[in-house]
Each structure stands twice: as structure tokens, then as C-alpha cells.
């Protein structure tokens, strides 16, 4: 309910009826002798005390999940469910190789993939909803994580084919000073990385931006339509540029801007050894991509 802020939506997400969920919340309020939620006709508002109870509940669930992990790991590694969270600017480009890896190397592993933005992934990891994340490092967030680097990749400048920079072998970063750089909407870590690169080059981009996209596929179509240029991770270039012949790509001169991709887990997880082996196997599966493996 705290996630959906609505009894009907929360009941549907938890596989129960709305009256049953409402009754359970009311019973908890009676047991504690305090109001935890404000009920309105449009949404549920968590009271300040309710937020504190919610924090305690999340810690209890996380501890329960850790206990389940420990029992599962003691039985046999790489068996049972594994909930993997992946950021949207990684999922379409690495999942094909990752899924093949899981099927061949870990046939008894029940992989569940969750594509979400970084803040949601980190919350899910801390709460025990997710086991391991595949995202840009450092992972950040308010809760500690154990980060396992996998590879570094460069960003590539993507332009319309008739752009003055199209066809050049490479460009310096300071070309960004004079370009209309299109960005993803707020909440994507790739947006923050692109903003940092532009600022390092001296470009003063507005935080809000006039044109924003929810995903990389839309972003490159905006570039193809002549609205500006953008920065793409090298792993996304072949997939996204292959959707249209109205794009050109230009490499940045060394040292090229880029990002580091890796795994993030909870510190002290009972499956730490599994995650390390998983990372090593994943590095081997990604060596054919345009990346620099981090051992």
C-alpha cells in the first residue's frame, strides 16, 4: 500500500481483496493504538507515525529475506529464485547474453528480471525485494551496497547523418558546448551522467531541459528527426542505430567519457560467493561487446 498509495491497486498487486487489505490495516492500527494512514477518496496518505512503522516493517522483511537466502544458499548454490534488477539503459543490450548464460551455466536458477530505474532498484535491494542489481557504478543510495564491477564502456555522440560532425573519426568533449544535447527524463542515471559530461566540457545545460525522452529508443528517434544530438553507451549503439538509417555516430577522442557497469548486492549476503562467481561468468559472456572488462 505504501508503494501504490491506493487500497485497490495495492490489493491487486498483493493478490488479495481490497476489503481484506483494508481490514488488515485497520487491525494493525487497532493493535498499535494509532492511525497509520489517512483514507481519502483518491489516495491513501501515510501518516508520519505510519512512515516510522513502515521503516520497521521493511527492516523486518529484509531480515526475513536474509534468513530465506541463507537457508537457500546452504542447500545448493545457483538454485531457487534470484530476483535481478536492471536499469533500462542496460537491460535491452545485455539481457540477451545474460539470459543465455543463465540457461546454460545455471539451469536450476529461477531468474526473475525487474527493469526499473536506479532509485527504485536500490530501494528494492535494501527492502529484500531484489537480490542483485545490474546498474551503473557507483550505485549510490542511502543504504550500503557491495559493488562488483564488470566493465567500462565509452559514450558515443549520435547525430543526424547531415550534421557537420558526422563522418569525423573523433571529436573532443568541448564540441558539446555548441550542441543541443537531448537527454532522458529525470530519474535515469544516464541523464545524470550525460549532464556531468556536458558540464565538465563547459556546457551549461538546464536541469529541466526542453525536450526529454523516457527511453533511449525515443531519444535516438528525436535525434533522427533533427531535434539535436545525444550521448549513447557503446553497448546500445548497434541496437539503437540499427533501427534507422537516419543516424550517424562519432567517437570521442581519448580519454573518452563513459560509465562503469557492475553488480550491486547487500553487504553480508549469504549468497556473496555465488554473486562473485556469477560476476566472473558474466564477464566472460560480455567479452564480445564493445567494452573493457574489469577483472
Predicted regions and their residues:
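Short helix-boundary/capping micro-motifs
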Residues: 1-20, 41
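A short LG(V/I)-centered, amphipathic sequence patch enriched
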Residues: 9, 29-46, 51
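Interdomain hinge and pocket-entrance segments immediately C-terminal to HTH DNA-binding domains
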Residues: 42, 48, 72-91, 105-110, ...
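Central regulatory/effector-binding core of bacterial HTH transcription factors
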Residues: 79-142, 204
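A late-sequence structural motif
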Residues: 94, 249-292
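Hydrophobic hinge/microswitch elements
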Residues: 117-130, 136, 183-250
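Secondary-structure junction motif
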Residues: 136, 165-166, 172, 180-201, ...
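Beta-alpha-beta core module
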Residues: 142-149, 153, 168, 175, ...
Amino acid at each position: 500500500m505504501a508503494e501504490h498509495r491506493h487500497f485497490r491497486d495495492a490489493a491487486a498487486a498483493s493478490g488479495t481483496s481490497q476489503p481484506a487489505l483494508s481490514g488488515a490495516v485497520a487491525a494493525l492500527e487497532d493493535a498499535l493504538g494509532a492511525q497509520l494512514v489517512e483514507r481519502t477518496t483518491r489516495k491513501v496518505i501515510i501518516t508520519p507515525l505510519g512512515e516510522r512503522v513502515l521503516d520497521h516493517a521493511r527492516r523486518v522483511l529484509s531480515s526475513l529475506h536474509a534468513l530465506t537466502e541463507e537457508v537457500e544458499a546452504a542447500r545448493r548454490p545457483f538454485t531457487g529464485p534470484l530476483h535481478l534488477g536492471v536499469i533500462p539503459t542496460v537491460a535491452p543490450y545485455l539481457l540477451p547474453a545474460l539470459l543465455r548464460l543463465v540457461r546454460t551455466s545455471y539451469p536450476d536458477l529461477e531468474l526473475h528480471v525487474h527493469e526499473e530505474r536506479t532509485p527504485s532498484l536500490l530501494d528494492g535491494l535494501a527492502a529484500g525485494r531484489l537480490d542483485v542489481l545490474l546498474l551503473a557504478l557507483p550505485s549510490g543510495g542511502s543504504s550500503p551496497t557491495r559493488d562488483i564491477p564488470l566493465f567500462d564502456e565509452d559514450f558515443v555522440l549520435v547525430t543526424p547523418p547531415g550534421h557537420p560532425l558526422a563522418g569525423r573519426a573523433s571529436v573532443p568533449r568541448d564540441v558539446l558546448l555548441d550542441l543541443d544535447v537531448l537527454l532522458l527524463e529525470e530519474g535515469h542515471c544516464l541523464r545524470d551522467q550525460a549532464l556531468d559530461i556536458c558540464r565538465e566540457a563547459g556546457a551549461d545545460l538546464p536541469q529541466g531541459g526542453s525536450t526529454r525522452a523516457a527511453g533511449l529508443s525515443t531519444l535516438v528517434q528525436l535525434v533522427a528527426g533533427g531535434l539535436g544530438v545525444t550521448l549513447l553507451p557503446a553497448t546500445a549503439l548497434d541496437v539503437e542505430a540499427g533501427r534507422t538509417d537516419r543516424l550517424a555516430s562519432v567517437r570521442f577522442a581519448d580519454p573518452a567519457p563513459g560509465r562503469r557497469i557492475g553488480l550491486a548486492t547487500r553487504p553480508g549476503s549469504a549468497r556473496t560467493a555465488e554473486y562473485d562467481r556469477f560476476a566472473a561468468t558474466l564477464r566472460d559472456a560480455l567479452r564480445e561487446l564493445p567494452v573493457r572488462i574489469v577483472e
